[in-house]
């Protein structure tokens, strides 16, 4: 059988994304035939014994597919969380619940909107790797009005615990006569855990609601709350399309599409 890189083998087993597999290898959590694995090491599926955190990994013949879900608030993006009342995988229809899927770009428990689930480790890696431009758009609702004069602060960002948190674009939605609004349209290419919430909090604003309504050119519209659909090849490609609106000023009337 053809030798494959160990991070690819782990990702294709459905355990996690390739990036997560690489991190596990670097952390010393992956072993091949009882020996600590090295990044880039090749293994022979079906012959070499690979374990991750003590769990044996086997190559699985499962279809490569990608799903998109309209995640509701209160649901955790995790394959297993002993403290969570409900995870995003609990919402899957039976036909997909049996597959080993993982999130390619999570949303925190209090946020809602588009989440990509996939069994394709290569796709997940492509979606999450910082070298790829994947534009994510968010509707942000605040407890208090945000003035237009402070939008540049969102673009410059802030440094919290050594990490630079920022957005690529930010526009007010339905600004009032004083050029302020409690609603914003925000674009990001990356997205660390709770980054948008932390950024607004650092600037003195409390996020009331956060919804990811677009990834690339794939929009939330038409997908009901808790709804799941399989993405076609064309729709998968659309995740990597940079929307025209990303390059120009926008004055959207609403992003409450569902």
Each language-model region and where it sits:
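Basic, flexible Lys/Arg- and Gly-enriched helix-loop patches that mediate nucleic-acid binding at interfaces
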Residues: 1-258
